[in-house]
């Protein structure tokens, strides 16, 4: 049963109804409709914290989805779930894959920077300043890319870049 049919939230039900109407009236292929249905169900499961179900839906959505832009958001959301699960290597992989298809995802650059910064902090706690510096430098590069795409955002990252003298 489609997740939209079992969700009891009024707003989710309304959104599902609107999405289903749009799917019927907008000319799309059956593959696009299938991908959207899986994507929508994945987002619903993700918003409820049902990450395993969300991942299953997102993976299913990648099969029929051929549009690089739409596919980038599916891959980005897979990265989000892996980040939430503490699977940072997998998360980075999916953020990279999303950016290959859509290089204008500042949130992917930001999330990659956050992971790199976190790894840098871990290296500091372990007493490995050389590794910490490498991770911090990588975080800086990703934050610079995110900021370049959306200059008014990521103020904390901008401050960190200035404090650590990595902002040019």
From Swiss-Prot:
Keywords: Chloroplast, Membrane, Photosynthesis, Plastid, Repeat, Thylakoid, TPR repeat
Primary subcellular site in the record, as a coarse category: plastid
Gene3D superfamilies with a match to the protein in the record: Tetratricopeptide repeat domain (1.25.40.10)
GO terms for cellular component: chloroplast thylakoid membrane
The keyword Membrane appears for this protein: yes
An example Gene Ontology biological process: photosynthesis
Localization terms from the record: Plastid, Chloroplast thylakoid membrane
Recorded superkingdom: Eukaryota
HAMAP family in UniProt: Ycf3
Annotated family: Belongs to the Ycf3 family.
Protein name: Photosystem I assembly protein Ycf3
